[in-house]
Amino acid sequence: KTSEKRKHASELSHPFKADYNDHFETSLQAYTDIAPLLDLYAAKLGKTRKTLVIYDPYFCAGSTVSYLNELGFAIVHNTNTDCYKVWQHQQTPMYDVLLTNPPFSGDHKEKCLKQCVAMKKAWVVLLPSYCATKNYL
């Protein structure tokens, strides 16, 4: 199943250069594990899963929206756009929390974390464990 998704993602046309090895969609289980944290943050804002606005700037094949919708999160921005151009032109959609699993190749992780800090909004970034020992900022 994972290889099918990976093949599908790599066959999509993207408006940005995409490394084949970066085409791994975040699993439903990962979102299920994060959902209680999102619930706590939503409650702090006086919102629910239906009204919390989630932004994932890194598009792969589109499962982010369907998985989060399946968990009851109704407003999810994850479009097939070049997030670096979106950020450069200050066209980031309005959101309550940024939730993403950035590509692991190149300097995507660093760019992502710098943007998260610069936006001064809530964020959750899924990274491999080896990143815990790195100083990206």
Task: Walk through the language-model features, giving the residues of each.
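Class I S-adenosyl-L-methionine-dependent methyltransferase catalytic core
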Residues: 1-137
